[in-house]
């Protein structure tokens, strides 16, 4: 199965991967990266995506077979960059007649962080706080733990708030949402890199390397969820209005 993966939630990443399974979608499915293109600029998604997509799809070993699906990051992220990636994914899916699946950007960061934490600490069931840059001196934040080797479970709703209020936002959860989220083992995400005060939110005071998710991790999560029969919608998680909005219509003076 050949999959195109696009993430424009922070910088921009485009990758084409192959799974080792051609029939069905197992919960754990090894993937091979055939091509990858990325850039770190957080404000040039629309200008970069076309060229990056062309490079990824024309790389050696990619053009010999058609794509079977597209996976795209659904945020949360600032409006313009996230929209560019999702629109591109939907256009590719529509023109090629293949399905498009969505995965939250925070989920991808959490999966990478849990991989790193498990390799370093050997914890069986750590809880990770993911905080990514939401601009306006705010972060998108939520708690996660592993759900098998390739997926994650979100323990809280996604909050958008100032870094100093993250602990409070996480604490204000229903019992069902907050179950098992009392101890935070580590922090990951671009918000943790920007706002060091977030580190104190974690009981072990550890910051993990993943600043953003990546296209390969999105595919791992998507395959795990599709293997369980889940539907992966592509509705974007903006969580607030766009930074740039159309001006209101002028009032007529009579």
Feature names for model-found ranges:
Residues 71-102:
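DPxDG-like acidic metal-binding loop motif
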Residues 61-65, 93-103, 119-123, 229:
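Phosphate-handling active-site elements
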Residues 1-76:
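N-terminal beta-alpha supersecondary unit
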Residues 21-44, 99-213, 238, 243, ...:
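Surface "functional belts" at beta-alpha junctions
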Residues 56-60, 95, 113-116, 215-225:
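Stable alpha-helical structural segments in soluble proteins, enriched in small hydrophobic residues
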Residues 209-238:
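Glycine-rich phosphate-binding/hydrolytic loop that grips phosphoryl groups
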